[in-house]
Amino acid sequence: MTVLALLPMMVAAQTVTSPNGNVTLTFSLTEQGQPTYEMSYKGKKVVNPSHLGLALACDKHASKGMNETDLMEGFKVKDTQTSTFDETWRPVWGETATIRNHYNEMAVCLNQPTSDRDMTIRFRVYEYGMGLRYEFPQQEQLNYFVIEEEHTQFAMTGNHTAYWIPGDYDTQEYEYQITPLTGIREVIAKNRESYKNNSSTTVFSDTGVQTSLQLKTADGLYINIHEAACLDYPTMHLNLDDKNLVFESWLTPDAVGRKGFIHTPFNTPWRTILVSDDARDMLSCKLTLNLNEPCKIEDTSWIHPTKYCGVWWNMIVGTKTWSYTNDLPSVRLGQTDYKKCKPNGTHGATNEEVKRYIDFAAKNGLQEVLVEGWNEGWEDWFGHQKLDVFDFVTPYPDFDIKALNEYAHSKGVK
């Protein structure tokens, strides 16, 4: 591992490149003091000048309460530090035994004089992309704050081809679309009624998409926008300004619409951009793993990959059901007596069916069998805002946990 000395630089604009020179990241402040970055790959612009910052909520839980102000502009560069890092580490499991973590870093320490608040924006630039995050040191003027929205922009250089699914706080069960960026709005509008009729989907914007977002440019660059090290912070979606082709972060809110209750010191997740002229690098690049926090589990001997089959896909395709009976319009945990109900004949998680899967797993070298729909409550579990849906311990009458567990172990299956 090598770490170079930190070099303080009192400048408002600074450039850092990847160790191999392919990726260039430039930071600057606008005339209004708003943080801005841009990015290029092998001399081709990947991200046009894009704004950075956070809007904070006027909230009684914040240190400044209803007098809260934003972290969007009015900044001055207090210090800039650069460094190089190079190490090789071993993941618990993965495609490779070792992973090289090699990057050049630039940390821009900002101060907002009107509020006397400090914020650092840290950039790490790799061979195939970069990551950026916001860092908030503990300080009297920024001890507790509530996020209204994070405004991290990704300004695209053209009407790229996008591989995307609609933005949704709860599910990813959509069909992937392949359209130009300007086609996202049209597809969501066309399918909005079908989205409304599916109680598992809730599209939050006319141009919102989920990460990771895969893009391809007209001149053959592959770009992926995602995040890493998402801890104690909402997950990030992207909302597109399709007139200007600018994506902006859109955080998942809580029940009252707030998007983060922060106690400093605190670091946000990394916002990542992968880029290459070879599509295979989107999968082989280890940038996300390198930016994730190191594993904190001391004994990892119990963690291992496995192969399994399961009783669930036949419910998805409609040949079996999760529910045990069709007799009742609704059920109540602890009150409904399933032994008095007539089986519907399509229940998937039965003793007979699960034994069939166990036999298949044992014969074909699969280590485990996954079973859904074995416990009481599946008759009206979805789409009703029901409080008590499952108790997760009481099986249906046609599912014997003890006997099936013993049978599986006798076959060497879990």
Please state what every model-predicted region is.
Residues 134, 278-280, 315-318, 375-378:
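Solvent-exposed loop/turn segments at secondary-structure junctions
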Residues 308, 321-414:
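Substrate-binding cleft of carbohydrate-active enzyme catalytic domains
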Residues 305-312:
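Boundary/entry segment of secreted carbohydrate-active catalytic domains
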